[in-house]
Amino acid sequence: PLMLGEGATQLVKNAAATAEQLDKMCEMFNTMGVTVTFEQENMLNEVIPYAGSAPAYLYAYADAFVQSAKQHGIDEDDALTLICQTMIGSAKMLLRRDKTPAELIRAVCSPGGTTIEGMKVLEDRDLYGIVSEACDKCIKRAYELG
C-alpha cells in the first residue's frame, strides 16, 4: 500500500522530537498514505496487525473469495476484479464514518436474503475470534522480537 500512496504509517511523539519535527515527519509520511501518531512507544507493537500486517490478512481474505469464485466457475481474473473493487468500495464506505461497520453490515444483510446466510457462517465459525487471535499472536511476536 505504501508504494501506491495508500499506506498507514505510525509514529510516536517523544521528547527527542519537537512538534515541528513531528509535523514534518507526518507531512512526509502522508505522501504515502495516512499517518497516526501515538504518545507511547509500546503502541507501535500494538498497532502492527492493523496496519503493518493487515495487508497480508486482507490478501488472504481476498484470495479465499477468489478461490471460492473459481469453484463456482468464475474466471480468476474476473473474480479478482470483482472482489478488489468491492473491497475498495467497502473501504470508502467505512472511511466516510457516517455509519459503524456493524451498521453497514446490517444495511447489506436483508432479512432472509443471501448475504445474511453467508454472515451466519462467518459468525458460526467465529470470524471475529479468529481475527482477534491472529492480531494477538502478531502483537505477541512483535514484543518477542523487541
Where do the language-model regions lie?
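Active-site PLP-lysine loop of aminotransferase-like
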Residues: 1-2
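Internal alpha-helical scaffold of NAD(P)-dependent oxidoreductase catalytic cores
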Residues: 8-46, 57-96, 141, 145
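Short pre-catalytic strand/loop immediately N-terminal to key active-site residues, enriched for Gly-Thr
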Residues: 43-49, 101-106
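NAD(P)-dependent Rossmann-like dehydrogenase/reductase catalytic/cofactor-binding core
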Residues: 81-146
